[in-house]
Amino acid sequence: MGKLSTHVLDTAHGTPAAAMRVELYRIAASGTPELLKRVVTNLDGRTDAPLLSGDKMRTGIYELQFHVAEYFEGRGAELAHEPFLDLIPIRFGIADEDGNYHVPLLVSPWSYSTYRGS
């Protein structure tokens, strides 16, 4: 069986983004999101266990939500009253239940990048 994982790197400080809140949603055919999991990244900017694995790993549309403003405020960053990046949603599809899907996020208070990792 495959798995879904993530890894968050803080490019403003050059470190893993430890203690960032991340939520995983499955998007129903109607477009309604269903919360599957809430996690906080560990000291390495990763989750302690895969976000999905085993029989929970199903094809479909998913969304990861990264609470970046909350994270950077916790690091002492001076953000505007309305931060440029608050919550970053990344919506993606899982086409193969046996595939390994890794969604890295490289982020600063002003920019982000992601890709499908392995």
Curated annotation (Swiss-Prot):
Entries under Pfam families matching the protein: Transthyretin (PF00576)
Alphabetical keyword list: Hydrolase, Purine metabolism
The EC number(s) this enzyme carries: 3.5.2.17
Annotated residues for binding of substrate: H7, R46, Y115
Primary enzyme class: hydrolase
Any one biological process term the GO annotation gives: purine nucleobase metabolic process
Catalyzed chemical reaction(s): 5-hydroxyisourate + H2O = 5-hydroxy-2-oxo-4-ureido-2,5-dihydro-1H-imidazole-5-carboxylate + H(+)
Matches recorded under Gene3D superfamilies: Transthyretin/hydroxyisourate hydrolase domain
CDD domains: TLP_HIUase
PROSITE patterns: TRANSTHYRETIN_1 (PS00768), TRANSTHYRETIN_2 (PS00769)
Transmembrane segments: none
Gene Ontology molecular function, alphabetical: hydroxyisourate hydrolase activity
Family listed: Belongs to the transthyretin family. 5-hydroxyisourate hydrolase subfamily.
Protein role: Catalyzes the hydrolysis of 5-hydroxyisourate (HIU) to 2-oxo-4-hydroxy-4-carboxy-5-ureidoimidazoline (OHCU).
Extra information: HIU hydrolysis also occurs spontaneously, but more slowly.
Assembly mode: Homotetramer.
Protein name according to UniProt: 5-hydroxyisourate hydrolase
Organism: Brucella suis biovar 1 (strain 1330)
